[in-house]
Amino acid sequence: MELLTFRDVAIEFSPEEWKCLDPAQQNLYRDVMLENYRNLVSLAVYSYYNQGILPEQGIQDSFKKATLGRYGSCGLENICLWKNWESIGEGEGQKECYNLCSQYLTTSHNKHLTVKGDKEYRIFQKKPQFLSAAPTEPCIPMNKYQHKFLKSVFCNKNQINFNHDSNISKHHSTHFLENYYNCNECEKVFYQSSKLIFPENIHIQKKPYNSNECGETSDPFSKLTQHQRIYIGESSQRCNKKCIIVFSQSHLKGHKIINTGEKSVKYKERGKAFTRGLHLGHQKIHTGEKPYKCKKCDKAFNKSSHLAQHQRIHTGEKPFKCKECGKAFNRGSYLTQHQRIHTGERAFKCEECGKAFNRGSYLTQHQRIHTGEKPFRCKECGKAFNRSSYVTQHQRMHTGEKPFKCKECGKAFNRASHLTQHQRIHTGEKHFKCKECGKAFNRGSHLTRHQRIHTGEKSFKCEECGKAFIWGSHLTQHQRVHTGEKFFKCKECGKAFTRSSHLTQHQRIHTGEKPFKCKECGKAFNRRSTLTQHQIIHTR
């Protein structure tokens, strides 16, 4: 059994797992790792202090300056964790860097801390000083160097000196506890995860700090304020999971998001598993709890990060900008999706037909074509759809809602696509051109129909009589001949028709409207076909 390394207590995420965390969870991860690292540093420094190597003030200074960050000269793929003193007489120089899944973190770069050693201040003499202005070198991968954080060469329990840290590592393994460590001074219980324990002699008599809440004595270098945070708001705040550290109050509410006690925790409500611990935010899905409320519109959310994203709608803030075209977004995920337009990347591939998509949601929608799944149902008529947007569009038929209005003529539509198509009438825009004859259309569907004239294709066949049509609407109209269905009824006289166009023509009898006018003689008609017949007179 070896001494503790940072990797023993670190939580590592795969790229896929990291993408599942929202910014608040990523920040919490960083804070937890920082506190774990500081605990390790404090234990290492205390080992030296207990041997009389460091004075008390030096320990306090060292702990305050212990920090976690990236090398200044490293890329975003490395996080820096500084190994303790290398050997007796080591001069000022750079410590090793651990490559620890930080390619997914967003912490700012920090200067590397070095240990200054010279003739006056050797490692095992009086006071090594942490400096924060030293330049840095490229990081060294974790798998190349496996340095220990605890570099004690003196065992307090047996009063034995060791010349090499590996020897004392083997020796110390005999003193480690396997599960829980109880402090006899304050009865605080620490869980020993991956051999992380807190020594009892933390309650030293040299200038102790006392907590006003519980009277517990803390060591001078571990910060009284950290100890006191446990008692803020409640007499005791503890995680009932097996955590490496006791979190500050700001972490207590959400620290279960990353619980390091188990590698996989299964959620009983739906059997969902979280590889790095039980996600507290997931529980809110089942409880319906939404503690984060927007002050502008009173909309509530179960995550603070979701509230932060929502508030950008009110402020208009769009902090995520595309470097290619300059387009800005209020969410990082939207920017990621947008950038795939420039790169042409289609990371989401259908296993059934091989079709690829640039968004996971598009793939999910597409897969319903293969499965036949239609999870979105209309509450009015029970009709089911494979997309939620289709239900929304369909429901407007029942409500009569037409939210999309033309600014030119005021005509309203129940679909945005219908408005777009309509606006081309005003602009004269005809994007869709036939390659055979050059005729252009303002709708893609119209071009598709037109092309069947050239190909002779009649895809829509009547099952009753076998008659085929080039347009689906023509087949629908034809089928009413067999069924006798007449949906379109005149409100004036009650006469019914199989086609809406026939009803429109009929209504002109009641209104007297004659929109079709002859250019030769000015005579007007209520039907186009009647005008066509009339124009033959002028051509004779």
Curated annotation (Swiss-Prot):
Its main location: nucleus. Pfam families: KRAB (PF01352), zf-C2H2 (PF00096). This is Zinc finger protein 519. Disulfide bonds: none annotated. May be involved in transcriptional regulation. Belongs to the krueppel C2H2-type zinc-finger protein family. Residues 4-78 form the KRAB domain. GO terms for biological process: regulation of DNA-templated transcription. Signal peptide: none annotated. One of its GO terms (molecular function) is zinc ion binding. The lineage of its organism: Eukaryota, Metazoa, Chordata, Craniata, Vertebrata. GO terms for cellular component: nucleus.
